[in-house]
């Protein structure tokens, strides 16, 4: 938000040789290479400042090209004096480059336990808990399946046997009915023969009786004729 520009580094600086009003003099401390750099801590040992993009003009020196160590220090010097404003005092018209750089870069200097914390609401809501479902392997065959298949086969065999028995019973029934019909026809034939025999006997008896009657009548007429002639 409010960045301090180092004197002599930026060309055409507004305050050459001194810091602008409202910016404290940074505390210079030697690093591992005995180079004095600004401290990244404040009086309360709080890390501040976000390493962002640095203009190449700030890295370039007027006398000679800096070494890699000096370039690395120069890239960190402008951001060391940046002070974060109090909560609620953010500038709505901040540069999009700084905002995007601050939101995308994450270093140990700015990570105080909240940026990568798994207890934050955003990380908890955006990354749901993985479902601890162990992948199940191919389940073994149920021991009841062979018995069920065997029972089904037995039922099918019983059904076929019943159908065959029904067909046999129907054939036997038809045959028995035919035999009964033949026996009834034969019985009728025997009865018819008996009736014919009885009728023949009756007819013969009638004929015999008729002959006897005729003979008796002839015998009676013969004496009467003798008497008339005498």
UniProtKB/Swiss-Prot annotation:
Composition bias, Low complexity: 85-94
Coiled-coil annotated residue ranges, if any: none
Transmembrane segments: none
Residue spans of biased composition, Polar residues class: 60-73
Annotated segments matching region Disordered: 1-103
Entry superkingdom: Eukaryota
InterPro entries reported in the protein's UniProt record: DUF4653 (IPR027812)
The family this protein is said to belong to: Belongs to the UPF0500 family.
Protein name: UPF0500 protein C1orf216 homolog
Protein's organism: Mus musculus (Mouse)
């Amino acid at each position: 938000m409010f960045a301090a520009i180092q004197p002599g580094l930026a060309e055409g600086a507004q305050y050459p040789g001194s810091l602008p009003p409202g910016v404290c003099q940074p505390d210079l401390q030697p690093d591992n290479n005995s180079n004095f750099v600004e401290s990244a801590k404040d009086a309360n040992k709080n890390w501040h400042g976000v390493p962002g993009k640095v203009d190449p003009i700030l890295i370039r020196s007027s006398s000679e090209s800096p070494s890699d160590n000096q370039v690395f220090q120069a890239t960190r010097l402008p951001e060391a004096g940046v002070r974060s404003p109090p909560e609620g005092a953010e500038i709505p018209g901040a540069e999009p480059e700084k905002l995007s750089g601050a939101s995308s870069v994450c270093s140990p200097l700015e990570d105080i336990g909240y940026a990568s914390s798994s207890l934050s609401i955003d990380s908890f809501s955006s990354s749901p808990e993985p479902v601890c479902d162990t992948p199940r392997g191919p389940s073994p065959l149920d021991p009841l399946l062979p018995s069920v298949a065997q029972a089904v086969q037995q039922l099918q065999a019983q059904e076929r046997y019943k159908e065959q028995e029904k067909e046999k019973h129907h054939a036997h029934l038809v045959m028995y009915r035919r035999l009964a019909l033949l026996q009834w026809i034969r019985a009728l034939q025997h009865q018819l023969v008996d009736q014919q025999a009885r009728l023949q006997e009756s007819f013969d008896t009638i004929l015999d009786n008729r002959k006897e009657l005729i003979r008796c009548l002839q015998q009676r007429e013969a004496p009467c004729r003798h008497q008339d002639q005498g």
